[in-house]
């Protein structure tokens, strides 16, 4: 239940962020990148559910039904495609943050009020208006994290970089975990309980 609650919160966060970063539209890839966390979480939740089915809940007789077997492997393949997309999306997000554009001739956030921009810090977006600009940042150097849409200051940019790197590393770690589970399921299906691979997996865990 906690996983589902967490999942719903991720969806809400992605929707809120996309309502700002994608307000001018974008390509399908841009949209999927905006919902990278939702896609990533969906894929690994489905995969974990499939592993549970295969390992503990479904009989060998059920798995030997050709149509069912193919359908399950097709779903699993799609999930891995989505996870590969997540690696790409988080990599691009991090890369873009390493190559942001600094705003020239701007030394105060309030100077940006007429431009209808948003300010981001710690993944939280705030509209820059005459009141909020006084409290959002006291720094004098600003960067576009989303060109002509979202800005942040130096400390905010460093925080966004760190968060993006954590997201990238997290999805890579989950891929390693899922690969380990795949091997365990493969060995389980063949009644292999001993050997170098089994010992290695136990040590890795």
Task: Give the positions of each predicted feature.
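Polytopic alpha-helical membrane-helix bundles and their juxtamembrane interface segments
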Residues: 1-205
């Amino acid at each position: 239940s906690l996983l589902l609650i967490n999942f719903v919160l991720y969806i809400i966060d992605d929707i809120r962020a996309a309502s700002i970063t994608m307000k001018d539209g974008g390509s399908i890839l841009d949209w999927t990148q905006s919902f990278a966390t939702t896609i990533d979480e969906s894929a690994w939740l489905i995969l974990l559910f499939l592993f549970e089915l295969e390992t503990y809940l479904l009989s060998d007789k059920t798995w030997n039904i050709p149509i069912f077997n193919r359908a399950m492997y097709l779903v699993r393949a799609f999930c891995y495609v989505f996870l590969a997309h997540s690696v790409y999306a988080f990599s691009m997000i991090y890369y873009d943050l390493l190559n942001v554009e600094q705003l020239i001739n701007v030394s105060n956030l309030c100077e940006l009020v007429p431009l209808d921009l948003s300010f981001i810090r710690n993944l939280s977006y705030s509209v820059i208006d005459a009141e909020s600009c006084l409290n959002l940042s006291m720094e004098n150097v600003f960067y576009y994290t989303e060109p002509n849409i979202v800005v942040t200051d130096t400390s905010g940019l460093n925080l966004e970089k760190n968060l993006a790197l954590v997201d990238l590393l997290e999805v890579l770690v989950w891929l390693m975990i899922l690969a380990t589970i795949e091997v365990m399921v493969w060995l389980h299906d063949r009644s292999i309980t001993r050997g170098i691979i089994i010992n290695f997996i136990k040590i890795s865990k």
